[in-house]
Amino acid sequence: MKVGVLALQGGVVEHIYMIREAAKRLGKEVEVVEVRKPEHLNSLRAIVLPGGESTAMYKLGKRTGLDKRLKEALLEGLPALGTCAGAALLAREIEDKQSGKRYEPLLGVADFKVVRNFFGRQRESFEANLNIKGIGTFRGVFIRAPVMVPLSPAVEVLGEFKGNAVMVKQGNIIATSFHPELTSDTRIHEMLLSEAS
């Protein structure tokens, strides 16, 4: 099966490696596609939206029409994992904790709000053990991390840190505040591949 990684900007290589490792653990044959143009979405069974800079990713995608096609695919049920800035791409609402500024939604396909820089800027990056529903203990790497605020009962909180949602799921969409690709633990990527089957 083909699994894509949005490859406009951000942590692409790390996600490609983790998808391949997760596939090995699950005994699945996976071809990883770097998604840069609308046609790269053809025949994908799942996609990862990596961390990086959500606005930059969106603007680059808009130039080729990738944004519209990706939004359609997600609304049609393409399983997706959005990590950090990737979660912001998916969110219906976005605001910055430091400035209070609200931003226009980018893809806006999931019923949660992303509060950017919730735990502070780059120097406030940290790691913490999380209890993830269906997975158990998972080491979360937080870098300029947001939190997610569910805006509908359709959004299930899978993990929290200090009472704030840091991993959520709505239908075909999984979003994390942290970076699972920066660990050696493939279980969140395995969750995505299981959704794609």
Curated annotation (Swiss-Prot):
**GO MF annotations for this entry?**
glutaminase activity; pyridoxal 5'-phosphate synthase (glutamine hydrolysing) activity
Q: Which UniProt keywords apply?
A: Glutamine amidotransferase, Hydrolase, Lyase, Pyridoxal phosphate
Q: Which PANTHER family match?
A: PYRIDOXAL 5'-PHOSPHATE SYNTHASE SUBUNIT SNO (PTHR31559), PYRIDOXAL 5'-PHOSPHATE SYNTHASE SUBUNIT SNO1-RELATED (PTHR31559:SF0)
Whether Lyase counts among this entry's keywords is: yes
NCBIfam families, per the entry: PLP_synth_Pdx2
This protein's name? Pyridoxal 5'-phosphate synthase subunit PdxT
What are the positions of the active site? Answer: 84, 179, 181
Query: How the protein assembles, per its UniProt entry?
Result: In the presence of PdxS, forms a dodecamer of heterodimers. Only shows activity in the heterodimer.
Q: What does this protein do?
A: Catalyzes the hydrolysis of glutamine to glutamate and ammonia as part of the biosynthesis of pyridoxal 5'-phosphate. The resulting ammonia molecule is channeled to the active site of PdxS.
Give a single Pfam family match: SNO
Any one GO biological process: glutamine catabolic process
Q: Which family does it belong to?
A: Belongs to the glutaminase PdxT/SNO family.
* EC numbers on record: 4.3.3.6, 3.5.1.2
User: Origin organism of this chain?
Assistant: Ignicoccus hospitalis (strain KIN4/I / DSM 18386 / JCM 14125)
Superkingdom is Archaea
